[in-house]
Amino acid sequence: MSLQGLMMKRTLLCWPLSCLFVLLPWPLATPTPITPWLCPPGKEPDPDPGQGTLCRTCPPGTFSASWNSYPCQPHYRCSLQKRLEAQAGTATHDTMCGDCQHGWFGPQGVPHVPCQPCSKAPPSTGGCDESGRRGRRGVEVAAGTSSNGEPRQPGNGTRAGGPEETAAQYAVIAIVPVFCLMGLLGILVCNLLKRKGYHCTAQKEVGPSPGGGGSGINPAYRTEDANEDTIGVLVRLITEKKENAAALEELLKEYHSKQLVQTSHRPVPRLLPASPSIPHICPHHHHLHTVQGLASLSGPCCSRCSQKWPEVLLSPEAAAATTPAPTLLPTASRAPKASAKPGRQGEITILSVGRFRVARIPEQRTSSLLSEVKTITEAGPSEGDLPDSPQPGLPPEQRALLGSGGSHTKWLKPPAENKAEENRYVVRLSESNLVI
């Protein structure tokens, strides 16, 4: 052989050796199949195959429904779509959703479509007309076993309560304004009645009892206080009438105006101890125009004369103890009248306001013909009145009756047979005569 042939053989032998030396530093690779392995339904590939197992069971809450090499998928949550669970999920089956929850509506047969609230539903929606009577689809398959022998978990039977009670809300919204309007209307009517003079009260007025109607006693004459005296009852009965109160106010105003005129045009008078009594004149320090005792001097007229009708009357004993001496103011233009009627003989003045005078007559037993007389006469006579001229030779009682003049009417009370009489009172007001 030639030398060239030997060189070619030597080159062919060195080529595999050089390739071997090049591949020796690389790590040895394990043989792998061309396609990955597949796991059965209910299992997923094991990420750690060191235990000798290539697949593992799906964890709770997940499932795998076919042969594949993917991990298990979580179960579907029906509550997110406001639906009820018709069948609970297993390792090989997903959760099956049923009808919509109470208060929600949605298309039937499409479990993965979310439900809508009934407040947005049309009037003829089938799911919202029934209140609380909503069936659950797939309840019959909630129990038992599956086709492959695995036990089925019972479905969730709870229902979401309806948060919207539209009927009750509408009723409350309608009732509250009605009550408010009724209250405002009642207040308005009460104010209108008060302006017209009526009295609005929330309590029922107690009327006369059925049994007390036949007593024949006028309720106006029934005293509220058992200790109230006769003068108090008389004054209360007079002042209860609006007409009498207005008349007394007019008399007081007229009396005050006359006093102001007299004091403004006349000098300070000088007191005469022997003159008869004039009820219009106020001696200031010793008068009983009011029932509070002696009054202090305040200007031309005492402060007690400026007051209106008193509230409490003076007792007859105090009035008798503090009766002032009669006085008279002389005037240059007009002489004092001789016909001015002083108090009757034996009378004790109780109250004197203007021309209104209340006096007390003590009991008199000297005469058997007349026991007592009650009259209402004028406190101050007119210009044309004549002085009293009682006839001589008559008893004192008849003189008292005849002393008032012929123009006034007298009523005589026949004597009571063997009956003790109590103190009587005389009320004199203006120019009218009246017997009580």
From Swiss-Prot:
Chain location of the short sequence motif RFRV motif per the record: 355-358
UniProt biased composition (Basic and acidic residues): 130-139
Glycan-bearing residues: N156
CDD domains in the cross-refs: TNFRSF19L
Disulfides per UniProt: C58-C72, C78-C97
Phosphothreonine found at: T230
Residue stretches spanning the membrane: 170-190
Cytoplasmic compartment residues: 191-436
TNFR-Cys repeats: 57-97
Post-translational modification note: Phosphorylated in vitro by OXSR1. Phosphorylated by STK39.
Family of the protein in this entry: Belongs to the RELT family.
Protein name in the entry: Tumor necrosis factor receptor superfamily member 19L
